[in-house]
Amino acid sequence: MKVIIVGAHGEAKELINRISSGWSISVIDLDQDKLRNFSTNRQIEKIQGDATSSLVLKKAGLESTTAVITLTLNDEVNLEVLKIAKQNDIFRLSSVVNEASNTDSYKNLGAEVVEPDILLARRFEHILEPRRVVSQAF
């Protein structure tokens, strides 16, 4: 199985360190310095370039990819990458959502989304009110 992760951030490092060794991993980022300093406990392919370019995605192995995860801080970039992936018959799409108003755009592509604001609020809710069973976040 192969995954392309767009955005060489802390979340990407944490994910790479957590997923099983059965995954072949490519990380794409525009920033060469970020990639140079991006280290994990796994062998990964690092690609410097614009992930909204089909050529860059193909260099990362898009044709043989099982999943694409976008973690950039720019929803426009994330959505464009996911559109290209979907056009190439990749259906395991996931992304961080930076602006809640863009959530429907991700879902319309069939992407699984993570909304950091909701995750943080839910975690702090459990810290403040640990005995509550039902969360107001649902």
Locate each region found by the language model.
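Cytosolic regulatory regions of ion transport systems
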Residues: 1-138
